[in-house]
Amino acid sequence: MAKKVTGQVELMIPAQQAAPSPPVGPALGQHGVNIMEFVKSFNAATANMKPGTIVPVVITIYSDRSFTFILKTPPASYLLKEAAGIKTGSGDPKRNKVGKITVNQLREIAEMKLKDLNTEDIEMAMRTIAGTARSMGIEIEGYKG
């Protein structure tokens, strides 16, 4: 018989840096999950990623207090900031541009995010990521999307 799902928790945790402190501890503790078991398995699953990369994770909790989790790709805004080499986006993206990326960097980010987006087409994924870049004040050199 299949286990009954009792909850689902979505968190954004830095790769290889999960710890029982907030936000992980309280979010899982209220569901009765073994927090250290999650921390160890999350850190092991993100071992091949660059430390500190923000990783969205969806944790499904079952009635016997066991859990499974799915790692998603880092947020587009995080990937764009990394590519442009900036700390934050622009407060006024229409007037104040804070960084530039190339079309190749845009395509790379779109290919990475493709499995989490609601499209199969790389061109549409690029348009989606370009919209995020535009709203952050990041210019894309040579892109007419």
Swiss-Prot record:
Protein name according to UniProt: Large ribosomal subunit protein uL11
HAMAP family reported in the protein's UniProt record: Ribosomal_uL11
Membrane-spanning intervals of the chain: none
GO terms assigned for molecular function: large ribosomal subunit rRNA binding; structural constituent of ribosome
Subunit structure: Part of the ribosomal stalk of the 50S ribosomal subunit. Interacts with L10 and the large rRNA to form the base of the stalk. L10 forms an elongated spine to which L12 dimers bind in a sequential fashion forming a multimeric L10(L12)X complex.
Recorded family membership: Belongs to the universal ribosomal protein uL11 family.
Record function comment: Forms part of the ribosomal stalk which helps the ribosome interact with GTP-bound translation factors.
Record keywords: Methylation, Ribonucleoprotein, Ribosomal protein, RNA-binding, rRNA-binding
Coiled-coil positions: none
Modifications made to the protein after synthesis: One or more lysine residues are methylated.
InterPro entries xref list: Ribosomal_uL11, Ribosomal_uL11_bac-typ, Ribosomal_uL11_C, Ribosomal_uL11_C_sf, Ribosomal_uL11_CS, Ribosomal_uL11_N, Ribosomal_uL11_N_sf
One GO CC annotation: cytosolic large ribosomal subunit
Source organism per UniProt: Sulfurihydrogenibium sp. (strain YO3AOP1)
GO process terms (BP): translation
